Amino acid sequence: MKFFLLILLVIFSIFENASSITGFDAIGSISTTTMKCIKEKGYEFFIGRVWRSMGSHDAAGIENIKNAVKAGYKHVDGYFFPCTTSRCSSAKTQVEEAHKELNKAGAKIGTLWMDIERYEWPSDKAKNRRFILELVKEAEKLGFKVGIYSSYYEWDVIAGADWNGGLNRLPLWWPDYDNEKSFKNFKPFGGFKPSIKQYNGDKNGPCGVNMDFNWY
């Protein structure tokens, strides 16, 4: 019986490792050749920046998305870092502009991840909640599959740890730089469940590219 259980554990471990997929996100220009180089090192998905926190599209990030597709990545997504100060356009307008720029460039993405982290957000949580809901509403209206990038600490400061506004139906991209490909240290917030983990960041990766490391 013990031997049988041991065999099951070994099989489960093999299956778990086989189903583990590693990818990356990065900013700055990355050529198709370099994308292929990174892919050959075992990275299977890429998430490129579509929108910058200063309130404009990321032309290099959108080009990276196209280059990742050309390089044959299994999944290619985009992330949206919103502009949140009083000088910024509305959430709706920002998403519309990002959509326009992606279409103009002919760039296709799987999921558009809304980057909700502490950077120039107002202290008014009610206002922040409305802004987040408007981001998601407009993105879904335009046909995007939407996800959320955040952690307990980021979400708590911006919108409140217990709030989700119905957004916990969306996949969560969770940052936690413990260098472990595991969800075991996830601190729950808003009823979300992690789908992807950013397990390390701002490191020198393969092929001379500075990147964040991701896993699911």
Regions found by a protein language model. Give the residues of each.
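Cleavable N-terminal signal peptides of Sec/SRP-targeted secreted and luminal proteins
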Residues: 2-17
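Substrate-binding cleft of extracellular glycoside hydrolase catalytic domains
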Residues: 19-144
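Functionally critical loop-and-helix segments that line ligand-binding/catalytic clefts
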Residues: 19-28, 163-216
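Surface-exposed, flexible loop/turn segments at secondary-structure boundaries
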Residues: 54, 84-86, 154-156, 180, ...
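Conserved beta-strand termini and adjacent loop/short-helix elements that scaffold enzyme active sites
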Residues: 81, 149-151, 199
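Catalytic domains of cell-wall/extracellular-matrix polysaccharide-remodeling enzymes
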Residues: 110-187
